[in-house]
Curated annotation (Swiss-Prot):
Belongs to the PPase family. It comes from Escherichia coli O6:H1 (strain CFT073 / ATCC 700928 / UPEC). Mg(2+) 2 binds at D71. Mg(2+) 1 binds at D66, D71, D103. Gene3D superfamilies: Inorganic pyrophosphatase. Catalyzes the hydrolysis of inorganic pyrophosphate (PPi) forming two phosphate ions. PANTHER family: INORGANIC PYROPHOSPHATASE. Keywords: Cytoplasm, Hydrolase, Magnesium, Metal-binding. Homohexamer. Disulfide bonds: none annotated. Pfam families: Pyrophosphatase. This is Inorganic pyrophosphatase.
Amino acid sequence: MSLLNVPAGKDLPEDIYVVIEIPANADPIKYEIDKESGALFVDRFMSTAMFYPCNYGYINHTLSLDGDPVDVLVPTPYPLQPGSVIRCRPVGVLKMTDEAGEDAKLIAVPHTKLSKEYDHIKDVNDLPELLKAQIAHFFEHYKDLEKGKWVKVEGWENAEAAKAEIVASFERAKNK
């Protein structure tokens, strides 16, 4: 099955499928799955010597305000392969703005059927403070050496805000 056929989730917005593009702690290469072919492309080599602190991907059949599918960070005990799909539940959102406009990043944890390790995490405030700081720091600085690019992190919002973002983005894609 093509990644293009992966549904947005099992029970939106509570139970979502995240298509992974970049594994946690991988080399500083930004991969993107082409939304027309489903192929994994190298988007760019990051200029900063930094790595994504969590697996990074998106929710199919959604459309964020930046014109792309909803971005999602997924902490896991092990890095996930690019092109893999993981069942998750949203727990929060990191609100940010970059040179192109609003660019929110959802945080979602693996579904309980995949791991009980995250069952106690119901909201972004249940995540370890160090992990939240690493995520914010990464996004504040990963574009520092790219001319004309910048990011401003505005702060964390809760699970309800993440779910609202999913619903709005799913509707936006459906009505496009």
